[in-house]
């Protein structure tokens, strides 16, 4: 499968190998409402990167291992911590990082915020097969299993464009699956949405037009999937250098940002190079 974009469309947006704070093997990445790019590191640091990539700063730490992260409309950041088996919340008003929820979950991987329903959904990567997705009240942090699976390494997630369900990666299948919201808010039946995502899909992101992007831990590649269409290879770094095991992606206009678990930087990809393709 030929890639739509050459690797030259990607560049190192910010290099944190020797910086303070150090961008140590970032796994999660997200766009703040103010346009800045945030990422988490293997030592539990939550880092804010200026929109132009010229500087970055430490905003909080769990002293753990941060995975996926997401923002609510107020700019509060919810982040999954592998070491502590918990979800932490960085409060935009108080500037404090505090444990938000942990009930039942073993390997919290990726959070999706649903302010309309008042819940936080978090994938659990434990077990094969294992429990798929937990749900926590956004106000209290109380919650438990929402989608019991079985799933095979539930990983990155994204809210469906119509907000009627969640898309999530099953890395060990490998595929992208979909679970709808029932009328009462319960999880519906899981179905396969995108198959043959080789070899280890990890993160997801929807573009405003409904295009689904799927990044892979291995090999270092990103796919594009359009409803009713076929799976296409967007970009691949066969040397795993500019893109080195991109575990999560975030979109801002015509730019895509990837975390790189294999290195110490955030990558920026120019999607305008697609030229309408």
Q: For each predicted feature, which ranges?
A:
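Beta-propeller fold detector
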Residues: 11, 57-61, 98-102, 144-148, ...
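Short loop/turn segments immediately following the C-termini of beta-strands
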Residues: 41-42, 82, 125-127, 171-172, ...
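Beta-rich, blade/repeat-based domains predominating
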Residues: 18-34, 62-77, 81, 103-130, ...
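Loop/turn-rich, solvent-exposed surfaces of beta-rich toroidal or solenoidal domains
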Residues: 175, 195-230
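A short helix->beta-strand "capping" segment at the edge of beta-propeller domains
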Residues: 1-23
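Short loop/turn segments that connect beta-strands within beta-propeller blades
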Residues: 49-54, 91-95, 137-141, 180-185, ...
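Beta-propeller domains
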Residues: 38-57
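A short loop-to-beta-strand structural motif that recurs across blades of beta-propeller domains
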Residues: 45-47, 86-88, 131-134, 175-177, ...
């Amino acid at each position: 499968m030929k890639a739509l974009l050459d690797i030259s469309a990607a560049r190192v947006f910010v290099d944190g190998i020797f910086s303070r704070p150090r961008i140590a093997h970032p796994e999660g990445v997200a766009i703040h409402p103010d346009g800045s790019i945030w990422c988490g590191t293997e030592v539990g640091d939550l880092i804010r990167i200026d929109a132009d990539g010229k500087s970055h700063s430490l905003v909080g730490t769990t002293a753990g291992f941060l995975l996926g992260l997401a923002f609510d409309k107020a700019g509060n950041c919810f982040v999954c911590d592998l070491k502590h088996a918990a979800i932490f919340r960085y409060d935009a008003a108080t500037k404090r990082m505090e444990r938000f929820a942990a009930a039942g979950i073993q390997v919290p991987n990726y959070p999706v915020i649903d302010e309309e329903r008042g819940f936080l959904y978090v994938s659990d990567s434990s077990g094969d097969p294992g429990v798929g997705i937990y749900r926590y009240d956004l106000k209290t942090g109380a919650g438990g299993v929402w989608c019991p699976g079985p799933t095979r390494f539930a990983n990155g997630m994204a809210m469906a464009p119509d907000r009627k369900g969640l898309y999530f990666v099953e890395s060990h299948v490998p595929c992208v699956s979909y679970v709808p919201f029932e009328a009462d808010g319960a999880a519906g039946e899981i179905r396969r949405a995108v198959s043959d995502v080789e070899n280890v899909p990890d993160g997801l992101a929807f573009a405003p037009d409904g295009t689904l992007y799927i990044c892979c831990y291995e090999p270092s590649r990103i796919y594009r999937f359009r409803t009713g269409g076929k799976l296409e290879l967007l970009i691949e770094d066969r040397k795993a250098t500019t893109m080195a095991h991109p575990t999560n992606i975030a979109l801002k206009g015509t730019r895509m940002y990837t975390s790189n678990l294999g290195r110490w930087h955030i990558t920026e990809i120019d999607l305008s190079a697609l030229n309408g393709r």
